[in-house]
């Protein structure tokens, strides 16, 4: 993360918001690069920047959920009433804090999800990830708007510190490697009597780097899919199962050689998904990318099937760690 952390912290420091009204807490998760050194240097220049070392609170190998542990530590020392999270490879917009504050004051929520998008670069892999992530972001916003609260992304979310403490933080899900975002969202929705909201504003979009290899992309998606078995909300499990079976049906049609049926089904799938994605792409200013959407349908179907399967069965690698 050393290549990204300085730009990330500087984007937060550049907020259109009073510097005395927020602090930046960076948790160093056993990094072996210059991340800690870079943050320490920034903290000497900017007093609102604080560096915490995860190694001072737990031993490596002591937990699977390093990020959850890091967030719990940060919350325990945070001075404010609200905590916003992002990742070291992210860039936040200048009105990020202002927009969160305005949303919180108006809606009085316990948890707020917000938009994330990959940085656009050249190449087929990046283009595919942009389209895939557009769909995920659209589903996230639509689900929260419908009161289902099934998805969120730790690169851009906020929660009330008192609400975090009230639900016991990550207690009960701290044995699961991923899910620092969605499991917390689910706990707050199920336990508290305060709304869970979505900050739907183009000036709140956090940008993050996409995977630069197909292997990295697949491992990331397997990691995301691995959370599904732990969901308490049966409606989410049912929807995910139906989506998986829907994608599997296309593979079965191909294996059976039912090409005419497959082509018609793909055409209907593409039409309805484009209908859903058009306003999402407009929000993220990525409508030109939709012209490639139909071309990536076969890859999208196969990867969804593979990620869903291996997410439940396979040990995966993430940031140099083997995780089951």
Predicted regions: what they are:
Residues 83:
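Short aromatic/hydrophobic "clamp" motif used to bind/position activated sugar donors
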Residues 56-78, 99:
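Glycine-rich, basic loop-to-helix element that forms the pyrophosphate-binding segment
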Residues 32, 90-91, 157, 182:
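Acidic metal-phosphate-binding loop of nucleotide-sugar-dependent transferases
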Residues 236-315:
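Membrane-embedded multi-pass helical conduit in multi-pass membrane proteins
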Residues 33-34, 88-103:
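Acidic donor-binding/catalytic loop of UDP-sugar-dependent glycosyltransferases
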Residues 149-159, 163, 182:
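Short glycine- and hydrophobic/aromatic-rich loop-to-beta-strand nucleating segment
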Residues 104-137, 162-165, 171-236:
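Catalytic donor/gating beta->alpha subdomain of glycosyltransferases that bind UDP-sugars
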Residues 9-60:
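Acidic donor-binding segment of Leloir-type glycosyltransferases
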């Amino acid at each position: 993360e050393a290549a990204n952390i300085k730009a990330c912290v500087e984007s937060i420091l550049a907020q259109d918001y009073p510097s005395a009204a927020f602090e930046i807490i960076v948790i160093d998760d056993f990094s072996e690069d210059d991340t800690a050194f870079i943050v320490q240097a920034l903290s000497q220049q900017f007093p609102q920047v604080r560096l915490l070392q995860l190694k001072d609170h737990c031993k490596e190998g002591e937990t699977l959920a390093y990020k959850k542990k890091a967030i719990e530590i940060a919350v325990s020392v945070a001075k404010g009433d609200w905590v916003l999270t992002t990742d070291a490879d992210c860039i936040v917009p200048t009105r990020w804090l202002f927009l969160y504050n305005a949303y919180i004051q108006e809606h009085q929520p316990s948890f707020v999800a917000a938009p994330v998008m990959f940085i656009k670069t050249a190449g087929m892999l990046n283009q595919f990830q942009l389209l895939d992530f557009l769909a995920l972001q659209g589903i996230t916003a639509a689900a929260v708007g419908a009161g289902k609260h099934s998805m969120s992304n730790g690169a851009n979310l906020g929660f009330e510190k008192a609400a975090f403490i009230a639900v016991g933080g990550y207690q009960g899900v701290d044995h699961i490697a991923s899910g620092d975002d969605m499991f917390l969202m689910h706990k707050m929705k199920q336990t508290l009597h305060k709304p869970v909201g979505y900050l739907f504003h183009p000036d709140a979009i956090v940008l993050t780097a996409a995977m630069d290899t197909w292997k990295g992309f697949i491992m990331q998606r397997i990691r995301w899919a691995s959370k599904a078995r732990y969901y308490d909300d049966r409606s989410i499990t049912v929807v995910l199962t139906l989506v998986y079976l829907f994608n599997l049906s296309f593979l079965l049609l191909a294996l059976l050689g039912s090409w005419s049926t497959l082509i018609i089904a793909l055409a209907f799938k593409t039409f309805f998904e484009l209908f859903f994605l058009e306003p999402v792409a407009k929000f993220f200013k990525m409508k030109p990318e939709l012209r490639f959407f139909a071309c990536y349908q076969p890859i999208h179907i196969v990867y969804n099937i593979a990620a869903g399967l291996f997410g439940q069965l396979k040990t995966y690698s993430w940031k140099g760690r083997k995780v089951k």
